[in-house]
Amino acid sequence: MKQFLMIMVMIATAFISSGQEANFTGKVKDEQGKALSGATISIKGSKVKTQTNTNGLFSIKATIGDMLVVSFSGFSNQSYTLKNSNPIDIQLSVSNNDLNEVVVLGTRSVGRTKLESVSPVDVFDLKTLTSEVPQTNLTDILNHVAPSFNSTTQTVADGTDHVDPATVRGLGPDQTLVLINGKRRYTSALVNVNGTMGRGSVGTDLNAIAAASIDKIELLRDGAAAQYGSDAIAGVINIQLNKNIGTGKAVFSSGANITTYQSYKQAAPGSFKLGETYPCQFCINDPKYYNNSVMDGRKTNASVNYGWQIGKTKASFINVTLNMEQREPTIRSGERTGDIDNRKSGDSASNALMTALGVDRNYFQMRVGQSRTRNLQGVINGALALKKGGEFYFFSILSNRVGNSTGFYRMPYQNSNIPAIYPNGFLPEITSNINDISLGTGLKGKMGTWNYDLSNTYGQNSFGFNIENTLNVSAYYNNQSKQSEFDAGTLLFRQNTTNIDFSKKLDNAINLNVAYGAELRYENYQQKAGEEASWANYMRKTGGVTDVLNGTPTSIKLADNTTGIPAGGAQVFPGFRPDNAKNESRTSTALYVDFEMEPIKKLLLDFAGRYENYSDFGGNLSGKVAGRYKLSDNIALRGSLSTGFRAPALQQRYLTKTSTVFQGGVAYDDATLPNDSKAAQALGIPSLRPEISNSASIGTTLKINKFSLTVDAYSTKITDRIILTDAFSGSATGDAVSQLLYTTLLANNAARGIFMANATDLRTSGIDIISAYNLKMPKKQSLKFEVATTLSKREILGKTKVSEKLLGRESTYMSPINKATLIDGNPKVKGYLSLSYKKDDFNLFLRNTYFGEVTHIEGGGTTNWFYVQVLSPKIVTDLSIGYKLNKSWRFSTGANNLFDIYSDLLVASRGSYKRLDVVPTSPTYDKFVESQSAFQRGVVNNNGISSNNQFNYSRRVTQLGMNGRYLYARIEITF
């Protein structure tokens, strides 16, 4: 009987103890034994979860018999049933399945996967992508893997040739916030001012960050200003740097564009018929077109990455990346058409001059295509584990880029040339020196029961302009100066951001996670003047003495035998004047709060609010509510409503410059004047206001085994979108406003003035569809399919917000070209289908990317006629094949744009276009009138449309670029 009672007591004790909660501790590590910081441990069937500290250690309240589920980004989930109270040692294995990828973007809670997030988040494994895909820089990679992301190199666009603008969901480059390791990244000092994508915006230079230094990228496709602050209207990009230790990789790749592009021949009037648009691609025997086979754009990239453990714990580390890339230019211009001799018109005069010079029409070809660049980058990422689970972390990114691009060719007897210096004319060059410096440091850990994160991030971008192979026409006429190289000045932007963040998961019925924090940000924009000869007009005289600032322009006989005022400043890019110099600063403070909860089973809600106050324009309050409802283990619904804003950039407020712009082959000096200038005030243009956004999204997620599908519909309305106007011109004999404008422009060495203004409202809406399937394969094989697409619509709402003094001049305030670039300059439909196959040491990657139609619009100038061409959709194929030669060496080769696809050629005849009547009250630009006039019918008149056959492909819109097929080879060495 005693034995029976003893057994019953033991059973009862075990039963009682099994139902009691206790603290269970353990450690999570990878296959090499390295501690995994940030791994999520949850109790299956419960809302209870925790996260490992920097040493991989965790503690969780549970009971004997509970099943723990351990997850970490890039690793397979592992389950563990609690059998006793002994410390738990869990080792995770690397996974090829990214369906359970844990994200930190869009949530301040821990352990959310991208399918569990209340907002759509894409996760891109850069370590895999940089081994598989042909692209090497960040914007190129993202342009082919994220349908909602668009970016291509720009051409003949001043500084924008050297910094690729990037957009999300077709909005502006400045409406997407970029984070590094969760901390705000600064923007470029450059404002995009020429007639290409992102005109008037200030973006972030993603290519200043070496792709080899990145572990993964998260792309939040939802308004998030209430969570992260200004700029997060279209979404947020979070770049997470490498943390690996004890292993390294060196990569060398080289390739070139081996391609055939088409261009028009010099042709006689009437050889193109009305309605004839562009030729079929590769019409080899068509006498109207050249098929130009070239090999150019050679690119060489070398990088090395390695991580070291610091001290005894693997939670303390430093990871270093060095990267170098040399990129040569591409040329996609055609045989120059039109007059060669500006003194006389007609082919006879042109042929006679070319014979005398010993050249042909191709000699005067422009360099239309990608610029030449050389990039040097260094990236450091590290952390030091502190006692009691704390961590000191740091990261730094250094980058230097030297770029070289060109402008329009100056013909031998054009007024912008001096034949005594350049008998054959010249192609002026813009050489950039772009430097990026950033340093982020922080301290995080626990303060009582709260998690804290105190950080400071500093960053700056400088953009120096050196103008080469050029001249100052007025300097030669003044004192026979033959100076051909000029320091045109420097732009500088600096930003310092200090954050303090707190968060806590409350152990209560609704599983509430509370986060709050504050931010202090300082910004400074500087514009440094160039040397005098870069901007001065030396033919401005006072009493016969040169007076470059206040003198009266003197007319003389110019190169084309006409009499006029010689141009001042360096041709292609006149430098910044001393009175253009700026040194402007501002501060902003912010407070935010975020509540994430599960009020009922299967429902996750998130509420966020943020108040920001700027020293230059005041405050803004943004809010967001988002939710996710789990219909079953496999299907969930999610949606969000949010408000947001974007503060006008200091660069937009204070940029002052003069640039040479061509319309219809005619050169103009355009002055971009500050928003607070006398000229802007005279025109009634108000001070810049923040852009305000209202966003809504609804979607669904599906996960069945190794298949996932997300479908998200969205709509974002933006009020008071900031744009760069077209050029206003004044008159010495006009009304008071016109006279003041004339005087102000003349003082800026320009004939026309451009301004920043809150000019319009717009809406973008669409659907994003993303699916992935990891096919079950035999051992040592894997096969993954991905299909993704975005369908979007952008529209301008209401009338242009023109000032009262400019009523009737809406088409200058916001031209049809500007409208077209905003709403039709990016593909509204874009998608891809990719296949990735691996077997043992062999891998194959195949991807087809669909770029939808875009609209090119040209015209204006001295007429009210605009010409519209819709460029048809294209499919670009990428292919790469790789083989692991041994334990350390891997070789791969392949192609970007395997079948050498180009956008449609711009049409050669104005008769091929539709005429657009300018309707000032029309919010769009789609009121066409088919013209049958003799001027348009059957006449080759592409000189004005494509600038003498130099722009065969559109430079205004962003579809798929204009480089053609790119072939490459890559060697990777792991050590």
Model-derived features with residue positions:
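Short acidic/polar hinge/loop motifs at secondary-structure boundaries
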Residues: 58-61, 184-221, 270
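Surface-exposed extracellular loop regions of Gram-negative outer-membrane beta-barrel proteins
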Residues: 245-265, 288, 342-355, 359, ...
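N-terminal periplasmic accessory domains that precede
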Residues: 86-91, 138-141, 145, 166, ...
